[in-house]
Amino acid sequence: MNLTNNFTLNELIYSTTAEKNKIDNTPSQPVIKNLKALCENVLQPLRNNLGCPIVITSGFRCAVLNKRVGGASNSQHLYGQAADLIVPQKNLKDVFNYIKSHLPYDQLLYEYNKTDK
């Protein structure tokens, strides 16, 4: 199911941890609605501006999966309102700054390795 031109439901719910541990990470309809809004308002506009693929490393997480990966008990991933991402062709700091200046968000976290600063 396409959520936008460049993002599918499958990529927003896929998890190797869920697959490995046989965790059903199927979202409810309200969560799918949230994921669609996330894609329409943040991820697709970001993709359009950057002009290159964005890799979602973590999107929706059901409660069992969220606990398994050590997510916060109030994580927005539980509601389909968060996505962790990388953009292999771009500098992480530049992506962060673009989101910060141009896109709507509730929380924006900049997680990096020492070499990414």
What are these model-derived regions, one by one?
Residues 1-47:
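Extracytoplasmic cell-surface/polysaccharide-interacting catalytic and binding patches
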Residues 11-18, 64, 69, 73, ...:
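Solvent-exposed, flexible loop/coil residues
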Residues 30-33, 73, 86-87:
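Short coil/turn segments at secondary-structure boundaries
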Residues 41-50, 94, 98-102:
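Generic non-transmembrane alpha-helical segments
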Residues 43-70:
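Extended, low-complexity, intrinsically disordered C-terminal regulatory tails
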Residues 49-51, 78-82:
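Short connector loops at helix/strand junctions that flank enzyme active sites
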Residues 54-57, 82-86:
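Structural recognition of the beta-strand scaffold that forms the well-ordered cores
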